[in-house]
Amino acid sequence: MLDGYVSFLLKIKKKWNCRKVIHIGDVVDWSILSYHEKNPSMPSAGDEYQKALKQVQQLYRAFPRTTVMTGNHDDLPARQARSSGIPAELLRSNSKIWETPNWDWRPRYASYVYEGVTYVHGDRGKGGLQAALKNAKENFTSWVQGHLHTQGGCSYFANQDSVVFGLSTGCGINYEAASMDYGKRFSAKPVMGCGVVLGGHQAFFEPMPI
């Protein structure tokens, strides 16, 4: 997580007087558990966990009541367990792993509807440019998603009966970390920020100054 990101989120919460907080996922990276090629200079799984736990606790202290859309990286321990034939009954929940008893962790691929707006992590449905708007059109409901680090912004679509929006929330990753080495070859870089939804009818992307 980028230094200063939690402080930025708190400022946005105060600015808009937000009553509800939804973490769109991923909460953590779990680079060491990734199925992709790994950087040999990366810390061990135990070291990565301890470092990530400190960051998660920063978020938890700032936002003690949060709905969390479990992302593909959040789910890596369970995915690795399945690959190894370990049943889900033997695993700890994300709530226990990250010591967040008051967070409402939703299952991977789940959707969460609040004030008529659908929230998902973003690793299902349509992708590509303006993925959030594509999914809003596909489901004809206002749609908020993350997952795609290089997308942040809101677009609207209307037919003769109603208007929907697609909001991409951006992210708060530390793109200079060793775990993000894979992104160095791409021109597009992560868009830092967060999303704000007002009354289920208006949405804004708030970019983080960097």
What are these language model-derived features?
Residues 2-100:
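Core catalytic region of metal-dependent phosphoesterases/phosphodiesterases
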Residues 11-21, 27-36, 57-61, 112, ...:
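Feature recognizes metal-dependent phosphohydrolase scaffolds
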Residues 68-73, 107-108, 206-209:
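Acidic carboxylate-rich catalytic motifs and surrounding loops in phosphoryl-/glycosyl-chemistry enzymes
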Residues 96-114:
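Short acidic low-complexity segments
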Residues 65-67, 102-104, 118, 165:
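Conserved beta-strand segments of alpha/beta enzyme cores
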Residues 40-41, 113-119:
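Short, basic, glycine/proline-bearing loop/turn elements
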Residues 7-10, 54-56, 105-111, 128-133:
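A generic local structural motif
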Residues 117-208:
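Conserved beta-sheet core of the metallophosphoesterase superfamily
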